[in-house]
Amino acid sequence: MIQNSAGYRSLNTASPMTVQVKNQKKICARCNKLVIPDSQRTKTTLKALGKYYHESCFTCQDCQKPLKPKYFPYQVDKTSESILLCQYDYFRRHNLLCHVCDTPLRGLYYTAFGYRYDEEHFSCTICATPCGVKKCFMYGNQLYCKYHFLKYFSKRCKGCEFPISDQYIEFPKGEEIHCWHPECYGIHKYWHVNLAAETVGLQYLPKLEYNPNSGDKDINPTAYELDKQMQAFNFILSKTWSVLYRFEEEAASCISDMFQYLTSNDQLKGIESTGLLVLKIDCLFRGLDTLNLSTNKSMPVNSDQECIENNAMAASKYSKFPKNLSTKIMIYLQLLRKLGTENKNETITISSFMSVITGLAHFLKLLTRFGLYTALENNKLTHSVNPLLRFLREVEKNELFENNPFQYIKTPVNATDSCAGCNKYIQEECIQFYEHRWHIACFTCSSCHKNINPRSLTDPTFNKEKKKILCSHCSIDDPASVPGFKFVTKLAQLIFLLKIALVKSRTVMLKSKASNKVGRNSLQSTMLKEQTYIRTLNDIKRLRSRRESVRVTHNKQQARKSVILETAETDLNDPTKQGDSKNLVIQTDDPSSSQQVSTRENVFSNTKTLTLDDISRIVAAEQARELRPNAFAHFKKLKETDDETSNVVPKKSGVYYSELSTMELSMIRAISLSLLAGKQLISKTDPNYTSLVSMVFSNEKQVTGSFWNRMKIMMSMEPKKPITKTVFGAPLDVLCEKWGVDSDLGVGPVKIRIPIIIDELISSLRQMDMSVEGIFRKNGNIRRLRELTANIDSNPTEAPDFSKENAIQLSALLKKFIRELPQPILSTDLYELWIKAAKIDLEDEKQRVILLIYSLLPTYNRNLLEALLSFLHWTSSFSYIENEMGSKMDIHNLSTVITPNILYLRHKEISNDNVPDEPESGLVDSFAQNKGENYFLAIEIVDYLITHNEEMAMVPKFLMNLLKDVQLQKLDNYESINHFISTVMQSKTIDYSECDIKTPVTVKDSTTTVIQGEINK
């Protein structure tokens, strides 16, 4: 017995280690009551984490279950407090419960899709097959093996209709969301071709509905058959995309270099780039030749006659493109040679060879598409994938040529392009014997004069000394004659002619360079042009990468494998270990592919590569720079020590309308309207003034989604608008919201919302021959136009297959769509302002006013106009090719036929001529109502907009500066903004220098002289 200072005695029942705390009172940490030892020891005192507990109080903090004999200490987050938990709640708080059986994970477990599984339940819900670490799929919060996931639950690709096993792109289109394999989306986007099962020699895999009571025996297909077919398809898909996209990048790089060196007057580098392009085109032509062979020889007797006829029609339609492409290269070489002989006081303008560079990219694009399309059609006819693989194998060889093209071009300088028989030019298929070539018609026996079959060339011989062709019968009498004839296809002959032109041009340029010395000023001018071009190139790459970037989603996920090595479990029956501090220890395998997944979250966002579609944008940007040198003065005059980064003097804002928020766009409209009012171009007494003011902030309704705004609309007593069920004739805002798509057809870095029909039409037309005469002028087949219209109206979210139509038909359909819009794209409310702008004499002031009016356009109108103007500018580059070829539709002619569809007034809207009894439909006869004057002024406006489409898409710098000032003043309504702008205009502090014209630049083409927006006939 031990007596304490208070005179109380207690029984020493503690261990020797606890004798020192005998005199302390024991308070229960749970109920805060005194712990009194029971003399009969029916109740024990428990100690954990340095605290005492009644036995009845020693329970789990979460579920109140008794913890004796084992407990788990758990430290509360962001505190130093530790609580006692049972095993289940301890693992629950650590998120270590199996997602399937809801039991604590002990030992090995797996993490996938944000859930954890024990080893037993990390398996397929249907067949219980263990899910591999790299092969786990989830649907409806349940795991499945690859076989059952692909068979029953996987999304289907919009392009190929195969199940999506891993990566896919979600692409909103109208009210639907389409899923694509990234490669299928790329192939469709760049060449408008889909890889269906029948086009790659595989069977279609239908999506089955899972029924647990069906007793499915895992057949049709079996797991092995499905896996084998998916592997085959993925190989074909990956091969097709990688080879053709790589070819497009390489070809685009060559054409870009050709453009750069032509503008910077560098002949030798230009000829090197051209030689490299010809070698790559040679690979494409060889691939096309394999398709012709497979078409002629490999088709089975029972082939689908319709498919054969379609192939023949496609071959006929595309037959002229190789010659057009080679002609463009010949013209380029002619321009390049001209640089050495051109008068030093004269320069070759970009507009003079715009069609050459744009045409090169376009015809090469068309031939690539034709090759892919034909290969897939041949696959369908032969029920195999061999035609496609042969085509890709030849095209892939272009990657062997990286530089120094003339080490691969062995054509001698004295090579001839004439027939050895008639001495006439050979541009078609022919017969070759070493350096000699003959037309097919000239390939006759020199002895018996019989025609020799060009397809059987093993028997005929050639006498080199006498230069005689001998047939198989006559060659017996001439032992000196030897065989060796080869059949040369039309495509191979075109390449041969290009190589002759390359070698001869290079020889002339080398001699010219040896005799001419380049001056210091010429070198500086070349450096300046190269730096300017590189800046344009980088801008185009950056804009395209941002505009086309698409986020990738994953079906499959690599599971993370983990093992629990230690927990904080404590046993009350083992007092020797109660003082040990134990923590939760988990060992986790780091998945090797986690970095790879993160780097592929966005596709089509590479800023280091070019595509053929970028070429036309580069040409347009450089032409705009040539037309407006002051507005695009990015560099000061070069000094010897200057570098690129120190010379940038931006005259443009660099901000595109598509990048602005809705509120910023509304403020821009308010600023522009105030500036126009300040210039007295519009006043409060004008009939359109009220509608223009209301239009300034009108677009806020489109994006404002607060509860009270929605309630205000719902409670409105105004009658609801009729539900639009058709595309043609529907309001533009309704089309964009209901059947719109975020398109990359704009100029800026951000996708723009336009109707699906416009996106499909323009994308399809970019894959067609735009040099056909009368594009946008002819009306096409009226009956077919009505059929297409009815088809589109009946299914607005899915455009028909436009690849079966011709360019004339689609251009007429596009014109019909924009003509039938209830309001013209350039807005009825702005019509008078456009006409007033055209009447302004001073070019500087006219440009400023046009920029202001353009900024007033409603968002969807401007989006559609941006895509349309860019496309029309590109279309104009095919107006003239050579020898009276081409569409004849230059910018002026395009403006003439497009203007009545986008800038006009209807009967009801013409002042002093309201006739209530007449129908509102139909356009005004401009000559009768407006004496013809406004008609030509409207054409001049549209001509200007097409010519300067790149500039129009960008917010003027003076407007951006005023926008910043308005935002600093926190002005948010038209009245306050108008007052502020009036004050600024009175102070005359607005910088309009980007619109100044110091030196007019004249750009001449076949029919039109454009002088800074002025058209001289």
Curated annotation (Swiss-Prot):
The modification Phosphoserine is found at S562. The record marks R777 as: Arginine finger. Coiled coil: none annotated. Residues 570-602 are annotated as: Disordered. GO terms for molecular function: GTPase activator activity; metal ion binding. Gene3D superfamilies: Cysteine Rich Protein, Rho GTPase activation protein. Residues 730-953 form the Rho-GAP domain. GO terms for cellular component: cellular bud neck; cellular bud tip; cytoplasm; incipient cellular bud site; mating projection tip; mitochondrion; site of polarized growth. InterPro entries: Rho_GTPase_activation_prot, RhoGAP_dom, Znf_LIM. Residues 584-602 have a biased composition (Polar residues). Its main location: cytoplasm. Residues 28-88, 98-148, 155-184, 419-474 form the LIM zinc-binding domain. Keywords: Acetylation, Cytoplasm, GTPase activation, LIM domain, Metal-binding, Phosphoprotein, Repeat, Sporulation, Zinc. The modification N-acetylmethionine is found at M1. SUPFAM superfamilies: Glucocorticoid receptor-like (DNA-binding domain), GTPase activation domain, GAP. GO terms for biological process: actin cytoskeleton organization; cytogamy; negative regulation of Rho protein signal transduction; regulation of cell wall (1->3)-beta-D-glucan biosynthetic process; regulation of fungal-type cell wall organization; signal transduction; sporulation resulting in formation of a cellular spore. It is found in: Cytoplasm; Bud; Bud neck. The keyword Acetylation applies. Acts in signal transduction. Activates CDC42, RHO1 and RHO2. Negatively regulates 1,3-beta-glucan synthesis. May be responsible for the down-regulation of CDC42 during mating. Interacts with CDC42, RHO1 and RHO2. Present with 468 molecules/cell in log phase SD medium. PANTHER family: RHO GTPASE ACTIVATING PROTEIN 18,19-RELATED (PTHR14963), RHO GTPASE-ACTIVATING PROTEIN 19 (PTHR14963:SF7). This is Rho-GTPase-activating protein LRG1.
